A protein has these predicted regions:
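Short terminal targeting/anchoring segments
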Residues: 219-221, 428-448
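A short glycine-centered flexible hinge/capping loop motif at secondary-structure junctions
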Residues: 213-217, 422-426, 463-467
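Small/polar-residue-enriched beta-strand and adjacent coil segments characteristic
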Residues: 25, 29, 55-56, 64-72, ...
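Periplasmic alpha-helical coiled-coil/stalk elements that build and connect Gram-negative outer-membrane
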Residues: 149, 158, 165-282, 393, ...
């Protein structure tokens, strides 16, 4: 009996393999975006420059401290940990669904004790009977002739694969978030150093002006103007101290652990990226490699597979229940010859009247597929805009940096000239103060543009799908 049951299981599995499926043929929707990215460099050579998703984050970021901070975040960040656990959960759910493809075989041992009163026995006396049985069998195994179970299995598989892409997408976002937080801290630290230096310079200028005022060489207006600039620099220094502290708190949160002081930057690095320039590539190819786009496509494939299950529900479902074993009135008799028992119960269920439930279920599945198509297309459009915005910013950053550096040089020269003219008695103190303000503002603006340039490299790397390796 046991060998027959095993043979039956093999036959059923083979029958399942040859069963049909009603999942619609999947066709990837066309990307609703232009054929090329605007502002992409025309000299880019795909053969010479690898795509962003092929560049590991360790190879992309130039600063060793930043690489170490990112490595810490990948180990300790809770959001990434949740994404990894979601993969384990989806994998387990897929295994549960996949198990329905095969018969579930179980063993049962039972004892039945029954007492009958004398009125119901031939002897006229009360009798107690016992029955022992031991069986192995399967219960309600569905023969998947129309692919309902396999469609649900395909849906579960796509959902599981989608969580894999979600984890990759979460890692890309984490790498970019850590890099931007680290760079922001570096910029604010540099701004703080500039504010402190400016405060010290203005403090010296204020002290000199006070002495000149006491000697009657300058007016009270000059003294108050010097005091105004001094307090402005003091306020800026306090504000940037607060920004630096907040930056460190944000960095500790995203990393998931306190950071050693030696990993925190005091100024923006000259080059945040070790890669000179990322190629934009062809939108339809580049965007299709982004994990968030792949996740959206997995959701679309899952919805498409669910249509197959909804279609199969219109057709008969056949299930089998079978068991084989032994039975005896005594425990020792279970192993005697002639005690074998077996049962075989096929069951077919044919939907006749469901009050529109099956049609409605199919409509829901098809509408959900259409929703996922729209979400997939929206994800591509959003990704295209991210890349296009980053490229548009990159196209002007070099010019902005050159202009800001030239402005700092010009204002510094103007300040030195104003200082010399003031000391020579040619210009008023007001002209010197204006030159100080202009130079300070130009230096702050240059730090901001340098931060934008570094952050643009991070944004473009993320937008092009880099950072998950």
């Amino acid at each position: 009996m046991m060998s027959k049951l095993r043979t039956l299981s093999v036959v059923l599995a083979a029958t399942l393999t040859g069963a049909c499926t009603m999942i619609p043929e999947y066709q990837r929707p066309a990307a609703p975006v232009p054929a090329t990215f605007p502002y992409a460099a025309p000299t880019e050579s795909p053969a010479a420059l690898p795509p962003a998703d092929a560049i590991a984050w360790r190879d992309y970021f130039a600063d060793a401290r930043l690489r170490e901070v990112i490595a810490l975040a990948l180990v300790n960040n809770r959001d990434l940990r949740v994404a990894a656990l979601n993969i384990e959960k989806a994998r387990a759910q897929y295994r549960i669904q996949r198990a329905d493809l095969f018969p579930a075989i179980g063993a049962t041992a039972s004892q039945t004790v029954q007492r009958l009163p004398g009125e119901l026995t031939r002897s006229g006396e009360a009798e107690t009977s016992r029955q022992y049985s031991a069986t192995v069998g399967m219960s309600a195994y569905e023969l998947d002739f129309f692919g309902r179970v396999r469609s649900l299995n395909a849906e579960a598989l796509e959902t599981y694969l989608g969580t894999e892409e979600a984890r990759r997408s979460a890692q890309i976002s984490l790498v970019a978030e850590v890099a931007n937080a680290w760079l922001t801290r570096a910029a604010d630290r540099e701004r703080l150093a500039l504010a402190r230096s400016t405060f010290e310079t203005r403090q010296q200028s204020h002290e000199l002006t006070r002495r000149l005022f006491e000697a009657g060489a300058v007016s009270a207006l000059d003294l108050h103007q010097a005091q105004t600039l001094l307090e402005s620099a003091r306020a800026d220094a306090a504000r940037y101290r607060s920004f630096v502290a907040q930056d460190e708190n944000a960095l500790a949160l995203v990393v998931g652990a306190p950071l050693p002081a030696e990993l925190l930057p005091d100024r923006l690095p000259d080059t945040a990226s070790a890669v000179a320039e990322l190629p934009a590539g062809v939108p339809s190819e580049v965007l299709a490699r982004r994990p968030d786009i792949l996740q959206a496509e997995r959701s679309l494939r899952a919805a498409n597979a669910n249509i197959g299950a909804a279609r199969a529900a219109f057709f008969p479902s056949i299930s089998l229940t079978a068991a084989a074993g032994t039975a005896s009135s005594t425990l020792g008799g279970l192993f005697d010859g002639g005690s074998g028992i077996w049962s075989f119960m096929p069951q077919i269920r044919i939907p006749i009247f469901e009050a529109g439930r099956l049609r409605a279920s199919l409509d829901v599945a098809e509408v959900q597929r259409d929703i996922n198509v729209a979400q997939y297309e929206k994800a591509i459009q959003s990704a295209f805009r991210e890349v296009a915005d980053a490229l548009a910013e990159r196209a002007t950053l070099t010019e902005q940096l050159d202009a800001r550096r030239a402005l700092v040089d010009a204002t510094a020269a103007g300040f030195r000239l104003s200082e010399a003219r003031y000391k020579g008695g040619v210009d008023s103190f007001l002209g010197l103060l204006d030159a100080q303000r202009t130079l300070y503002g130009a230096e702050l603006d240059l730090i901001g543009v340098r931060l934008s340039a570094a952050a643009n490299g991070v944004t473009l790397y993320k937008a092009l799908g880099g950072g998950w390796q």
